[in-house]
Structure formats: structure tokens, C-alpha cells
A protein has these predicted regions:
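Short cysteine/histidine-rich metal-coordination sites, predominantly Zn2+-binding motifs
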Residues: 64-75, 92-101
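Positively charged, low-complexity terminal tracts
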Residues: 2-3, 89, 94-194
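Short cysteine-rich clusters marking metal-coordination/redox-active sites
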Residues: 46-52, 77-80
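Short, intrinsically disordered terminal segments enriched in charged and Pro/Gly residues
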Residues: 1-45, 89-103
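Flanking scaffold residues of small Cys/His-coordinated metal-binding clusters
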Residues: 41-50, 71-72
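Short recognition patches in nucleic-acid-associated and regulatory proteins
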Residues: 48-68
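Short Cys/His-rich micro-motifs in 6-15 aa windows
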Residues: 82-88
């Protein structure tokens, strides 16, 4: 079990070793996932496990649990069992807790499935507002793919951020990934509209 205080990973110096930076990124993503959804229930996030047992990528996803009283976040892989506890996350820029956005009476929230590659691209979008960031990090892993839950307005807003980043991306390969994510989200939005 990896016991960590997120405050130790927040402002790493420029010369910090690569493994420390990767661990800081993973812990930050776990905190984002755990705080993007409600407290009190363990759930399987779309975050992939970073371990490589037998020098092969672990196929598991990270299960997160945040108790009602914010003290620590527990996480573990649903496949290999790797896990830990994170403290010192409250108030950090990874903390996505916020009151839910008020919904209009006629708004319906729909679940839609996207491939894991699309979910990974969405987590790498650099400019997201807090509502879209919560949408991306509360995605759940299933056997069919990654399930995002959103209403039409949330999905449309996320599409705008993905399109803006794709239009300004100089790396052709990353732009293609963003374009595929945009196409998958557009299909989901059209499905919601019909």
C-alpha cells in the first residue's frame, strides 16, 4: 500500500526524476477522479493502472473511494491490487469538489460509451473548465468501454474545448487523436438529440 501526502508532490522542482513526476501525475489524477463524483461510494474510474506486472501493462482500472468526511482518498487497481491512500489533497488544484451545476427541468442526463483511447485523450486536454473536468474524471470503466454521463449542454461544452485544442495543436498525431475524440463526442451528442 502506497501511503502519500499529495502536498509533497504539488510543486516538484524542474530536476525531479521522471518516476517522481509520473507518480505525481497519477496521484493527481486519482484525486481528480475521487473528487469529481460523489463521496461515500467506491467506484471504478476510467483511470488505467500504471503498473507493469511481468513487464506487461496491467489491464486494470483504478477503483477510488472518498469517505463523506474528507480526510483521505483510498485507491486500488481492480486487477493487480496495487493501491494506496492519499492525504493532503483538500484545496489542491486537483480537488474538483464543487456544488453541482443546477439543471433545467427538461435536461436529461444520458450515459454514452466511448473507447478507452478517447477517454485518455479527454484527460489530456489542457484547457477545460471545472465542470468539463469533473465530467471527464467521473467517467466509469465498464467491459464495453468508458461511460461518460452528461446532458446535452455539458457534452456540447466539452466538444468546444476538444475542437479548440485540436485546431491549435501543432503535433499532427495528437491532432488526429483529438479529432477522433471530437468525432466520438459528436456522435454521442447527435444520438442524444434524436
Amino acid at each position: 500500500m502506497f501511503v502519500s501526502d499529495l502536498r509533497h508532490f504539488l510543486d516538484l522542482p524542474d530536476d525531479a526524476p521522471g518516476p517522481a513526476r509520473k507518480m505525481a501525475e497519477q496521484l493527481g489524477n486519482v484525486v481528480r477522479a475521487a473528487t469529481a463524483a460523489g463521496a461515500g461510494t467506491a467506484w471504478v474510474s476510467a483511470l488505467p493502472c500504471r503498473r507493469r506486472p511481468g513487464r506487461r501493462p496491467c489491464p486494470g482500472h483504478i477503483v477510488v473511494f472518498r469517505p463523506d468526511l474528507p480526510a483521505r482518498i483510498e485507491w486500488r487497481c481492480d486487477s493487480c491490487g496495487d493501491g494506496g491512500v492519499i492525504s493532503g489533497w483538500e484545496g489542491s488544484y486537483f480537488d474538483l469538489r464543487a456544488p453541482p451545476r443546477p439543471r433545467r427541468p427538461n435536461e436529461t442526463v444520458a450515459d454514452f460509451v466511448v473507447p478507452e483511447e478517447v477517454a485518455a485523450v479527454l484527460r489530456d486536454v489542457l484547457l477545460l473548465d471545472p465542470d468539463c473536468e469533473r465530467l471527464v474524471y467521473r467517467a466509469r470503466a465498464t467491459d464495453d468501454g468508458v461511460v461518460l454521463s452528461a446532458d446535452g449542454d455539458e457534452l456540447d461544452e466539452l466538444l468546444g474545448f476538444v475542437a479548440a485544442e485540436a485546431n491549435h495543436e501543432p503535433n499532427r498525431r495528437r491532432q488526429q487523436h483529438l479529432d477522433r475524440a471530437f468525432a466520438a463526442l459528436s456522435d454521442a451528442l447527435q444520438t442524444m438529440g434524436s
